[in-house]
Regions:
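A short aromatic-anchored loop/beta-hairpin motif
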Residues: 1-83, 87-143
């Protein structure tokens, strides 16, 4: 399972919380964008957030409505992202795509998810491994 972190949907967290009948006491979260986590199961929501006592570069992925309730009440994690859907692959499909160089792999960086504006995440992730996206060809293969 994978989660896309740079594709905002046209809905805000307020819409999701209202749909789930969760009271909002933390007004600052109403306009938080909801992300498209992937094309599969878009009726399923996920919250990626820091732990209560954050360890360097560790996050929790939770499908819990209770996590959203805590966030809405101002008692939840301060750094979080909410998404609907996920990316999924059949057995062996991801490995095949990796072997065909269809993916560029970068190390996880929690600050990329929580601190970088959504529209800059792709470029910043590529920069973590020394890529300049503007110089990348749209053709893949083996040299």
């Amino acid at each position: 399972m994978g989660l896309v972190i740079n594709k905002p949907l046209h809905i805000k967290l307020e819409n999701v919380l209202n749909h789930l009948s969760i009271d909002i006491r933390n007004e600052t979260i109403k306009q938080v964008p909801v992300l498209m986590g992937g094309p599969v199961g878009q009726e399923h929501g996920f919250v990626i957030h820091e732990q209560k006592h954050p360890h360097e570069n560790e996050v929790i992925i939770s499908p819990s409505k209770e996590t959203l309730r805590q966030i809405a009440q101002g008692k939840g994690p301060k750094r979080f992202a909410v998404m609907l859907g996920y990316a999924g692959w059949d057995a062996g499909q991801l490995e095949e795509e990796l072997a065909q160089n269809d993916w560029v792999i970068a190390p996880f960086d929690a600050n990329l998810l929580f601190e970088v504006p959504i529209d800059e995440r792709w470029q910043k992730a590529a920069a973590l491994i020394g890529f300049d996206i503007t110089k990348m060809s749209d053709f893949s293969g083996h040299a």
